[in-house]
A protein has these predicted regions:
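Terminal connector regions
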Residues: 101-155, 225-246
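Short, basic/aromatic beta-hairpin or loop at an interaction surface
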Residues: 63-73, 191-196
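Short, hydrophobic/aromatic beta-strand segments
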Residues: 53-61, 180, 187-192
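Bacterial N-terminal signal peptides that target proteins for export
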Residues: 1-12
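Beta-sheet-dominated interaction scaffolds and their linkers
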Residues: 25-48, 159-172
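Bacterial N-terminal signal peptides
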Residues: 10-20
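Intrinsically disordered, low-complexity Pro/Gly/Ser/Thr-rich segments with frequent PxxP/GP/PP motifs
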Residues: 69-102, 198-225
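Asparagine-centered strand-capping/turn motif at beta-strand->loop junctions
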Residues: 47-51, 177-183
Length: 246
């Protein structure tokens, strides 16, 4: 019965999203990412309803497929409650618990998943006419999904998480800049700046997330790499700008 209910909510939300043209998220997440230490019994994510009407909230975790539904997601974590009604100006705590098979995840590096929160607003009430009949006009309704990163972090990783950005390796490779992550953690960079004619130019069109023990490269604007910096996003979602040292 629960399976059918969850599937129904997801289907209705998709229909609403397809026909909608505008919308505003009333459900606000208190965090831009979730870190799950492998030895934790559970971790919590707080959310609140900043709107003036109740919202139906559905939450689930996927392994990177943005099109996956709650019933298709195959991950070793569960969220309680998966569906909840959040009253206006009230909050809700989502409790995330690892299943026993989470121990089968790689214990030598972080794993990344995505946490989804679907905000399904109520149907607007029809207007009453003078004869007390309810006028039900056509309306557009939008279900808004928030999606944030969810990191599973093995406790066996002993590196200092606060100095991760200092371990990034930067190498000029012709007209490109090679970026190496020699750590077992995911590193998220929101901007890479190159100074040109005393103006900072962001070389990233969108953020860059480096997987553990991986590398990537971007194209430089010119050969001048003497004044470059980057913005690193830490565990708390804070953005920290640092000088690139070659």
């Amino acid at each position: 019965m629960l399976f059918r209910g969850r599937k129904f909510f997801w289907g209705m939300a998709c229909l609403q999203a397809l026909i909608a043209t505008t919308g505003h998220a009333e459900i606000v997440l208190h965090g831009t990412r979730v870190i799950y230490p492998s030895d934790a019994r559970e971790v919590n994510l707080q959310l609140s309803n900043n709107g003036t009407a109740p919202s139906l909230v559905q939450a689930w975790i996927d392994d990177g497929n943005a099109k996956s539904t709650p019933d298709e997601a195959n991950v070793p974590f569960i969220i309680t409650p998966p569906i909840s009604r959040v009253e206006p100006s009230k909050g809700q705590t989502l409790r995330i618990t690892a299943l026993p098979n989470a121990s089968q995840l790689n214990q030598n590096k972080e794993s990344v998943f995505w946490l989804n929160v679907l905000d399904i607003p109520p149907r607007p009430e029809g207007k009453k006419q003078e004869n007390n009949e309810v006028l039900t006009n056509n309306f557009l309704q939008l279900a808004i999904r928030s999606r944030i990163k969810f990191f599973y972090r093995p406790v066996s990783l002993k590196e200092n998480i606060n100095t991760l950005s200092e371990k990034i390796q930067w190498v000029k490779n012709g007209e490109n800049l090679l970026i190496k992550n020699p750590t077992p953690f995911y590193i998220t960079i929101s901007s890479i700046f190159q100074e040109i004619n005393h103006q900072k130019i962001d070389l990233l069109k969108q953020g860059l997330m480096l997987s553990p023990f991986s590398e990537d490269q971007i194209k430089l604007k010119n050969s001048n790499i003497t004044n470059m910096s980057f913005v690193y996003i830490n565990d708390y979602g804070g953005r920290i700008e640092q000088v690139i040292r070659f």
